[in-house]
Amino acid sequence: MEEKNHIDHYANALYSIWLELDKKNKIIFTSSAKDIYFSLKNNYEMVHIIDSNIISKEEKTKILNKIFFDLSKSISNIYLKNFLFVLNDNNFFKRILEIFISFFQKLDEHQNFLFIRIYSPFVVEKKLLEKIEHLFSIKTGKRVRYENIIDKSLIGGMKIMFGNDVYDYSIKGKIDQIKWNIENNKEV
């Protein structure tokens, strides 16, 4: 729970910086934050390197500076670059992706968006994704964005997550529920 509080703390710090920026710099900041997020998500080894105890903090700072050197071109990106340095200095870089996800959720809330993750063992057809998007838009009264994430462990069906809510329509979820009911002597 303490790590979750730290994640929220750092995400709130990013959000506070974003709120202080003018419109142009908000766009640059958001775009750069997404670029960093996807770069690190797609190259997770980088997170492990920065989180490693083998490399000194000074070396990690040099690595971050070299990789994200272009970020220093605008004031909003200087904030992001310094934010990465703070995470490194505080030995919390391992949670960078979770921090960015929390930050993006705060932006979505600010802009009346709901971001949902649709987990399935296969790519869901666009028509079905649009139906899901429409249903959640009606249910929540918000504009909806979604991401279809492939999770082969689900076997079939899908699991939809947003915020702390989970709608599990997967075969794996049904099997897990039956298993739980049997273990707890509940009717199936």
Curated annotation (Swiss-Prot):
InterPro entries: ATP_synth_OSCP/delta_N_sf, ATPase_OSCP/dsu. Keywords: ATP synthesis, Cell membrane, CF(1), Hydrogen ion transport, Ion transport, Membrane, Transport. Its main location: membrane. It is found in: Cell membrane. The keyword Kinase does not apply. It holds the Pfam family OSCP. One of its GO terms (cellular component) is proton-transporting ATP synthase complex. The keyword Membrane applies. One of its GO terms (molecular function) is proton-transporting ATP synthase activity, rotational mechanism. It is a peripheral membrane protein. F(1)F(0) ATP synthase produces ATP from ADP in the presence of a proton or sodium gradient. F-type ATPases consist of two structural domains, F(1) containing the extramembraneous catalytic core and F(0) containing the membrane proton channel, linked together by a central stalk and a peripheral stalk. During catalysis, ATP synthesis in the catalytic domain of F(1) is coupled via a rotary mechanism of the central stalk subunits to proton translocation. F-type ATPases have 2 components, F(1) - the catalytic core - and F(0) - the membrane proton channel. F(1) has five subunits: alpha(3), beta(3), gamma(1), delta(1), epsilon(1). F(0) has three main subunits: a(1), b(2) and c(10-14). The alpha and beta chains form an alternating ring which encloses part of the gamma chain. F(1) is attached to F(0) by a central stalk formed by the gamma and epsilon chains, while a peripheral stalk is formed by the delta and b chains. Belongs to the ATPase delta chain family. This is ATP synthase subunit delta.
